[in-house]
Amino acid sequence: MCAGGVCPGLLRRVLSCFPGNVSLSLAYGSGVLAQRGSQPGLMKYGVISTEDMLDDLLQWKTLYVSGRLHKPVRILRQQDGEGRLHNALQANLRSAITAALLTLPESFSEEQLFTTIAGLSYTGDFRMVVGEDRNKVENIVHLNLEEFRHLYAQFLHESPHVVYQPSQGRLELDKSADTQFTQLLALPTHLQQQLTNLVDPPGRNRDVEEVLLQISQDPDCGLWVRKGISTIVKRSSLSQSVKGIITAGPVKAIRYSAQKVKKMWKGFLTSRR
């Protein structure tokens, strides 16, 4: 993944590496310019401005780029003179752990935690119901378990609310209302606002902190967090799907969807065995 100030010169250099029929479209709602190569050797990538990327990493406006960066990735090049991008990437990982912990019980395994984290950006994505392998998230974690450990170990050891036992692959979590309130206050502000909109009826206009305090004392606190994330992802995934059809064209979109459905059925049949 590469981020930087998007400029015509950069785009020309990127596009010069691909065939002349490479398409370019703005993926509204995420700030990502989606690029698709042509067969053979189909390649899909995206270009995003630094400011849009920072915004999503810190605020979770779309959970599109930030959600992908909850998983282990290989950063090929990073121009970050002031350290803003590095700090935002770290904040995004910390937010992912915080959100996941709010939805988990008092005791759970490493794999449960990482599966929850990897699944955050798919929560509310309609494509996970129709068109995606049902085992997609589990497969991501299973194939990259050691990378997930490396990515999140420091945050888990630093957390005052978690007892992490790497040798046993188990974690114990303080689920008191006070701890949950502290965790809710640490969530990205856009997610906090979504939670406020869900819990507060129209016209009340209560302070965000007051609403989060109420949620922290609710036995369904984790469910509210999932609903808030789902609201963000649902809007973003619909936008991405529409723009994906425009970018690829209807014929390619149908072929791509057919491949997705095939993978979905394969995953469904595998899970039934």
What role is predicted for each listed range?
Residues 145, 151-205:
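Active-site/pore-lining binding-face segments in mid-to-C-terminal subdomains
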Residues 34-41:
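Short glycine-biased active-site loop of nucleotidyltransferases that positions the nucleotide triphosphate
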Residues 1-28:
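Helical scaffold of the NTase/Pol beta-like nucleotidyltransferase catalytic core
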Residues 23, 32, 55, 59, ...:
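Polybasic/polar functional segments that serve as interface/processing modules
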Residues 29-32, 121:
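Short, flexible loop/turn elements at secondary-structure junctions
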Residues 179-273:
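Charge-dense, extended regions
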Residues 42, 46-166:
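Conserved NTP/Mg2+-binding pocket subregion across the NTase superfamily
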